């Protein structure tokens, strides 16, 4: 489950081509977290971990501070988080997460991307069952850390997969248990390198190279939109590229 998702994420960042898009996405997340939980990271767990995300992506400190200040500004128009679900070409399910200050603009744009690229926008909640909503934590390795012991300890907190990479450990857990998992990690001295929410497809659909090209067009159009934060789908990745 996890490694395939990490590969998809790496491809998405490669498509974006520069860090400006990553910074825009992170900035919105930071602003939303500061608006909901306050601007002080010591009192706001979600903001705290997003600041670690920003550090990992080399986001300038002034960008982070600006995103936090935006949340407490009296002139700030609040972002509304909206999800859109639909089918792309060849029956590929596509789940779109947005953060916008103008929902009318956003839904019109998202619908046009589907319609102009052989897809159709569905009703809210219609495709949610096709994806598992997960939280993901990347933590620094500890000396003499037993992954088996850690996994057993975290089962009670909703963690269902633990993976080891060269420099870090990656935990996948239930979305609803995000706060509990973060609290456990912080209280037990684990360094959280980054954290995110993902939607992992329950089943992947095989496509031909020609079909893949059509599907990737709609995914790219969606990801290029400034209001779109994340795009998830159930198309199986090209095994030759993953290798």
Swiss-Prot record:
Disulfide bond annotation, renumbered to this chain: none
Keyword Disulfide bond: no
Keywords for this protein: Cytoplasm, DNA-binding, Transcription, Transcription regulation
InterPro entries: Integrase-like_N (IPR017856), TACO1_YebC-like_2nd/3rd_dom (IPR048300), TACO1_YebC_N (IPR049083), Transcrip_reg_TACO1-like (IPR002876), Transcrip_reg_TACO1-like_dom3 (IPR026564), YebC-like (IPR029072)
Alphabetized GO MF terms: DNA binding
Compartmental location: Cytoplasm
Family statement: Belongs to the TACO1 family.
Protein name: Probable transcriptional regulatory protein BDI_1233
Species in which this protein is naturally found: Parabacteroides distasonis (strain ATCC 8503 / DSM 20701 / CIP 104284 / JCM 5825 / NCTC 11152)
Biological classification of the source: Bacteria, Pseudomonadati, Bacteroidota, Bacteroidia, Bacteroidales
